[in-house]
Structures are given as C-alpha cells and as structure tokens.
Curated annotation (Swiss-Prot):
Cellular location(s): Cytoplasm
Ligase is among the record's keywords: yes
Principal localisation: cytoplasm
Gene name per UniProt: proS
Chemical reaction(s) catalysed: tRNA(Pro) + L-proline + ATP = L-prolyl-tRNA(Pro) + AMP + diphosphate
Family membership noted in the UniProt record: Belongs to the class-II aminoacyl-tRNA synthetase family. ProS type 1 subfamily.
Entry keyword set: Aminoacyl-tRNA synthetase, ATP-binding, Cytoplasm, Ligase, Nucleotide-binding, Protein biosynthesis
Protein name: Proline--tRNA ligase
Record function comment: Catalyzes the attachment of proline to tRNA(Pro) in a two-step reaction: proline is first activated by ATP to form Pro-AMP and then transferred to the acceptor end of tRNA(Pro). As ProRS can inadvertently accommodate and process non-cognate amino acids such as alanine and cysteine, to avoid such errors it has two additional distinct editing activities against alanine. One activity is designated as 'pretransfer' editing and involves the tRNA(Pro)-independent hydrolysis of activated Ala-AMP.
Enzyme class: ligase
GO biological process, one term: prolyl-tRNA aminoacylation
Length: 570
C-alpha cells in the first residue's frame, strides 16, 4: 500500500474532547472520526486493526468448536418481554416502533434471539452441545458515552452462546471459552487478568471478566499477593474476621454534633477513629426504602446489596425519603428506632459501643449496641474491599488493587433464558429437559483501544505486531531521487511478495514529518531509505517499541522484518 494513495488523515494537535490516550491517539492517527456521541466512523487504518482482532477471535472461536452465524441487530420486543428483560434492562435499551406500531429494540446483546433460534431448531440431545457466535455491531444507549471506543453507544462485539444438556456439560463449554479467551488476548499482545465478576443484567450464576491492566481503566480489580484469586471490585470479597469486641456495653447517650454530617467530620469532632462509627444509608430497592449499615471506614457495594435484596432497581434515597424514614436530614440517620428493613455488613456484627446518627438534626448517639438498641434484618457482605484486606481464598495473602479495562466477559447462564423461553430438548429416554446455556462476549473495538492504552509513548502508538494495521513502513526520504525510489520499490516488492503488510511512505514531505507520522500510527518496524546510506549499500531499520536502530543491507533488512513478522504470527 502506498501512503500517497491511502486515507490516513493524521492531525498534530490533541482534540480537546478526548480524555484518554487511546481516544487521543486514534483521532490523531486518523483511525476513527466521531459521527455522534458514542458513534464513530472506522477509518481505513483503524479498521485494519479492528479486522486483525476479529480474525484472531474468529480463529480461536473456530478452534474451540464454535460455529459462526449472523443475527439481526433489530429485535422484536416480545422476545425481551418473554425473558423478563424488557423492563429490567433500563434506558440503555433503545426501543422504537415500526409503521405498524410493533415494538422493537436495537440489540445490545443477543441472548433472547439466539435462545429463540435454538428452541425452534434443537429438539434432541443428539444435537447438543452446540456453540454459536457472531461478530456484529451492537447498540447500547449509554447515558454518558466517553473515552472513544472504550465506552461508545455503537460498537463491534463478538458474542457466543453455548447450549448443553446439563450443568456438567455446560461447565466444559465454559472452560473451553475461558481458555480460548486467554489465547485471544495473549495473541493480541495484551497484559491481562481474568477476574471473578458479577453477572449484572446478563444474569446467570457465575462469570469472569478479562481485564487489560491499565492505569486509565474504569474498573477497579483486586488480586491476592499469595494465590491466584482475582476479582473486580463489584464481586471481590475479603476473608471475614471472627473477632468480636469484648468491651462491656455502656449506656447509650446523645451527643451534640452541630453541622457535623460526614463520617470524617463526626470522627474528628468526637476524636475517634472512623472505624468506631456505623454509617446508616437509606436506599430505595424497587422504590421501597431499605437501610444499609456499614462500618464508618467502609464503602457500600451497591451490586452486592442489590443481589442480596433480589431487586431490579437500587438507588440512594433522596432527602425527602431520608427524612420520612429517619425523621432527620441526611447526615444524622441511625438504626435505632427505625422500622425499615435493615441490612448490616458483616464487619458491623462484632462491633460494640459504636457511634451512629440519632435520627435528629445535629445529634449522634454514642455507645450503641446491636440487639440491645436495635435489631438487624440480615447480616451480609455489602462492602467494597480495601487494600490490605485478607484474601478470602488463602490464609497468607492480602488484597492489592489494580485498574483495568474490561475487554471480555464469560457467563454461566444456567437455565435463566432457556427456562423463561422454554428452550428444551428430549433426552435419551424421551423426557423433556431444559437446555443449559453460557454466553461469551469480546469488545472488538475496545480491545484495540485497550491495546493502545497499554502500548504507547510520548510519540504515539506502539502496536503489538499481530494487530498493527501494517507490519512495516518504508520511509522513502526523497522519491524524486532515482536511487531512493528504486531501492524503496524493491524493498516494498520483496516484503509484499513474502506476505508482509507494508506501507510505502512515498509522499513528498520532509523526513521529520514522515518519521512523526510513522511513530504516531504505531507501525512496529520502519525502514528508512535515503541516498546517503544507500551510497554504502545500507538502509536504516528501526524498531518502534525498543527504539533500536540498525544499518543493514537491503537483503538483511528484508530478512529481519520477515523473521520478526513470522515469529510474532506463528
């Protein structure tokens, strides 16, 4: 490919609305252009990397025994109503009506469609197991699309769905996909962790997220210093201490805390540690008030609480509801005397003589004790873990924190969709059985963006060779010189004939301009062809990642590029 005939609209300035480095560099490198909020054009250079990831995904899916198909983006509402997700999914589901007033949605995922297809076609255990996948555009009406391809509204995704006769067989399918995902991200050249995760709106009994490690990541993940335990913060647990304070209960008393609303303010005012307070949070679960209690230095994990309550919606209550439930403004709530359901974190269970709000403005209670002063409906793990918490899986490790970008997610769905939608088969005895399912997603564009977050420097992108738009760029310093043009064309022809994806920069531009563009778009290897070095029979070969520069003969440079590509793609 010749640069002068290609479409790579690079820009030197960083766009003001691009917050993260991948968004900045993909815009500057002429890889994407914004059409609307969270909706992008994939330009030729960006599309080449997208296709590279798709091909790796397709190869590994096929290797794992999955079969490719393609489903419609437009989905009928009746399928979502049948599964129970039409209302549950919320405003991210873009709904519309056609001219006949029939309701549809733009698919953010395809569990309903694939389950409907399989229940129509699969009748016998002899047709199972089967794993079907597609690579297709999706749409989720994100409330705040941001970060370019990292959190868009329209995006490219690989989604696969496995169907099995029972849970044991479904576990085998799950493990096949888990291992396939590891191979995919290894082949893409990414540093990643597979972590335990909440199943969210997809549902099911178990899931893992594949997280690319990056400081810019939106997700917090934890891992153990001593074993292989890892989870995202929504799912992460800490080993619960059996320690109970043995102090004798003291008389409860009211103390004045004028305008001291926050945990930090109250702790400082009373000269106590934040862990000696219990915070009282009022929430609405499916619009019904519920109270959560946590140790003062801990934070509520709304996902854990939502799962415990089994509600569809959970949100912090507004001031009006807080006053109605507690009789006091926000900041002075406490559990004593409340009639609402109270869910307390496990860390509260062993506390004695703690401080809470008094359910009256500018007042708190000291020496509050469980059982004597109030009762709890349920004790459960409802907090976020913190750095240094003991690992829940081993005796010696503690938890450390990382930032990550979710690029893949695998789910054990069990019978969530097949039971709701009556997807069944006849077993060997002719009895009707419910199909067990799994689903498995990879964000294709997000994988490219995450790769850039992990692979860049001050000059631009440093693509891993397997997903780089081109393997090598030839920077011809002056194509008007016969010797430079002939040598550049010869190198280009030899590399192309060997199957190397090569971009010949034949533009009439200054050398420095060409070098900056080559660094910006992140092509792994650069051959510089100039008359000065050609006089000695040499060209310059530079590695984008290491910055190493070598003067080599044309033959040696070509062989070195071929060897590097073959090694990376084998």
């Amino acid at each position: 490919m010749r640069y002068s005939q290609y479409f790579i609209p690079t820009v030197k300035e960083t766009p003001s609305d691009a917050e993260v480095i991948s968004h900045q560099l993909m815009l500057r490198g002429g890889m994407i252009r914004k059409l609307a909020a969270g909706v992008y054009n994939y330009l030729p250079l960006g599309l080449r990397s997208i296709r590279k990831v798709e091909n790796i995904v397709r190869e590994e899916m096929n290797r794992a025994g999955a079969i490719e198909l393609l489903m419609p983006t437009v989905q009928p509402a009746e399928l979502w109503q049948e599964s129970g997700r039409w209302e549950q999914y919320g405003k991210e589901l873009l709904r519309f009506r056609d001219r006949k007033d029939t309701e549809f949605c733009l698919g953010p995922t395809h569990e309903e469609v694939i389950t409907d297809l399989v229940r129509r076609e699969v009748k016998s255990y002899r047709q199972l197991p089967i794993n079907l996948y597609q690579i297709q555009g999706k749409f989720r009406d994100e409330i705040r699309p941001r970060f370019g391809l990292m959190r868009g509204r329209e995006f490219i995704m690989k989604d696969a769905y496995s169907f099995d006769v029972d849970e044991k067989a479904a576990d085998i399918s799950y493990d096949k996909m888990y291992q396939a995902y590891r191979r995919i991200f290894e082949r893409c050249g990414l540093k990643f962790r597979a972590v335990e995760a909440d199943t969210g709106s997809i549902g099911g009994s178990w899931s893992h997220e594949f997280m690319v490690l990056a400081e810019s990541g939106e997700d917090a993940i934890v891992s153990c210093t001593a074993c292989d335990y890892a989870a995202n913060v929504e799912k992460a647990e800490a080993r619960q201490s059996a320690v109970t304070e043995h102090a004798d209960p003291r008389d409860m008393e009211k103390v004045s805390t004028p305008e001291k609303k926050s945990i930090e303010e109250v702790a400082a005012f009373l000269a106590i540690h934040e862990s000696s307070l219990v915070k009282t949070l009022v929430l609405l679960a499916d619009n019904e008030p519920v109270v959560a209690l946590l140790r003062g230095d801990h934070e509520l994990n709304e996902i854990k609480l939502k799962n415990i309550l089994g509600c569809d919606t959970l949100e912090m209550a507004g001031e009006e509801v807080v006053v109605k439930v507690t009789g006091a403004p926000t900041g002075f709530a406490g559990p004593v005397g409340l009639k609402a359901k109270i869910i307390a974190d496990l860390a509260v269970q062993g506390m004695k003589n703690f401080v809470t709000g008094a359910n009256a403005k500018d007042l708190h209670l000291k020496n509050v004790n469980l059982g004597r002063d109030f009762n709890v409906t349920t004790f459960a793990d409802i907090r976020n873990v913190v750095l240094g918490d003991p690992c829940p899986r081993c005796e010696s490790g503690t938890l450390e924190m990382w930032r990550g970008i979710e690029v893949g997610h695998v789910f054990k769905l069990g019978t969530k969709y097949s039971k709701a939608m009556k997807a069944t088969y006849l077993d060997a005895d002719g009895k009707e059985q419910i199909i067990f399912m799994g689903c498995y997603g990879i964000g294709i564009g997000r994988t490219v963006a995450a790769c850039i977050e992990q692979n860049h420097d001050e000059n631009g992108i440093i693509f891993p060779l397997p997903i780089a738009p081109f393997h090598c760029i030839i920077s011809a310093l002056n194509m008007k010189e016969d010797v430079v043009r002939e040598a550049s064309e010869a190198i280009y022809g030899q590399l192309a004939a060997a199957g190397i994806e090569v971009l010949l920069d034949d533009r009439d531009e200054r050398p420095g301009f060409k070098f900056k563009d080559a660094d910006l778009i992140g092509i792994p290897m650069r051959i510089v062809v100039g008359s000065k070095n050609l006089a000695d029979g040499k060209v310059e070969l530079k590695c984008r990642r290491s910055g190493e520069v070598e003067l080599l003969s044309i033959a040696d440079a070509v062989e070195k590029v071929k060897a590097a590509v073959n090694a990376a793609l084998k």
